[in-house]
Regions:
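Active-site-adjacent elements of ketosynthase-type condensing enzymes
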Residues: 73-79, 130-151, 185-200, 252-260, ...
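Intrinsically disordered, low-complexity linker/loop segments enriched in Gly/Pro
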Residues: 77-90, 97, 121, 125, ...
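Membrane-interfacial loop- and helix-cap regions that link adjacent transmembrane helices
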Residues: 197-204, 208, 225-244, 249, ...
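Claisen-condensing/thiolase-fold acyl-transfer catalytic domains that form or cleave C-C bonds
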Residues: 69-70, 88, 94-118, 218, ...
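Condensing-enzyme catalytic core mediating Claisen C-C bond formation in acyl metabolism
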Residues: 1-38, 142-219, 223-227, 311, ...
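Short, well-ordered amphipathic alpha-helical segments that serve as non-catalytic structural scaffolds
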Residues: 1, 41-56, 109, 160, ...
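Conserved beta-strand-centric core segments of catalytic alpha/beta enzyme folds
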Residues: 3-6, 60, 102-184, 288-325
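Conserved beta-ketoacyl condensing-enzyme motif
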Residues: 2-85, 97, 235-255
Length: 325
């Protein structure tokens, strides 16, 4: 079963929260405790679900996959929304705490949900929605003067987005452009566990990103992208000049190192840079924002191959090969 993504919706969930006043200097303990931050996450995330499903005519999906690395509660915001909306038969999957690469395991889960229903279950799934709620500013140390804090506070940002996955037969009824999944792959890089971390602290989630990360990714990226392309019967070196690269912009250095290593043009990564420049690093919500631009761009024709990848704790390198349809 081929699964396609389409109909991206990007809400503005702002409700006037004041993080500097409410959270102060997190490292010296003058801010709110973690449970208070999770309460605000719950409020914002619930607001996101209300906005992305505000059309009364929209039919409920078979499943919703909720993706986040910045807030977790039980019951979750998606469960609260479904209960109040009366969509009680919608399946819920929580895809949490994977950081910047979280969109790809979520797509893999959607692929599994749809594929298994068409092979071994009596009820075939027609649509699986994926909703990202990344509220990273909730965890910033806005007053800290440590060098590492400058990186996290200026690089990371809030991001919210919804899109959908369909079996091929159902996608044709939407009348939308989409991305057909051709291949998926994932690797953990050796000897890299401490280079990127995301751990709960007493007041907030502590994020760390070492200077070695761009170079460790660079050294592994050629073999990785070649393996993805081989799954789809493509030769990377032969095809790369015509590809679009939707690379998660973990930072400018990561994009620079990958582009140089793969020998691709700056124009092939311009959408990644555009999202980083305009929105920052929104963790798991970043790659879907780039996919949205791919689908909206009149300069990227139907049939174009899109090689997308992201990186996170582990170090994990994960990616997908798409075809614009």
């Amino acid at each position: 079963v081929s699964v396609l993504t389409s109909r991206f919706v990007t809400p503005d969930p702002s409700n006037g929260y004041e993080p500097i006043r409410r959270y102060g200097n997190l490292r010296t303990g003058t801010g709110e405790p973690l449970n208070e931050r999770m309460s605000l996450f719950e409020e914002i995330a619930y607001n996101v679900f209300e906005r992305v499903y505000q059309d009364d005519e929209v039919a409920p999906p078979d499943d919703i996959i909720h993706v986040s690395c910045s807030g977790y509660l039980s019951p979750s915001p998606v469960q609260s929304y479904l209960s109040r909306r009366g969509w009680l038969a919608v399946g819920v999957t929580h895809s949490y705490h994977m950081g910047c690469y979280g969109a790809f395991p979520a797509i893999r889960t959607a692929l599994g949900l749809i594929g298994s229903s068409h092979v071994s279950l009596p009820k075939r799934k027609r649509r699986v929605d994926l909703v990202h709620t990344e509220f990273l500013s909730l965890h910033f140390d806005l007053l800290g003067d440590e060098p590492d804090n400058f990186v996290t506070s200026t690089l990371f940002a809030d991001g919210f987005i919804k899109y959908a996955a369909y079996p091929e037969t159902e996608f044709g009824k939407t009348g939308q452009n989409g991305l057909r999944i051709l291949a998926l792959d994932e690797r953990i890089l050796p000897d890299s566990l401490p280079e990127m971390t995301l751990r709960p602290g007493p007041l907030q989630f502590d994020m760390s990103l070492s200077k070695r990360v761009p170079f460790m990714i660079r050294d592994s990226i050629t073999d990785f992208v070649s393996a993805i392309c081989e799954q789809a019967g493509l030769d990377f070196e032969r095809e790369k000049g015509a590809m679009v690269f939707a690379i998660h912009p973990g930072g400018p250095a990561i994009l620079n190192q990958i582009r140089a290593k793969l020998g691709i043009e700056e124009s092939q990564v311009e959408l990644s840079r555009k999202v980083l420049h305009e929105h920052g690093n929104m963790a798991s919500a970043t790659a879907p924002h780039i996919w949205q631009l791919v689908l909206q761009s009149p300069d990227i024709p139907v049939g174009a191959k899109v090689l997308s990848m992201a990186f996170g704790p582990g170090l994990t390198v994960i990616g997908a090969l798409f075809e614009k349809v």
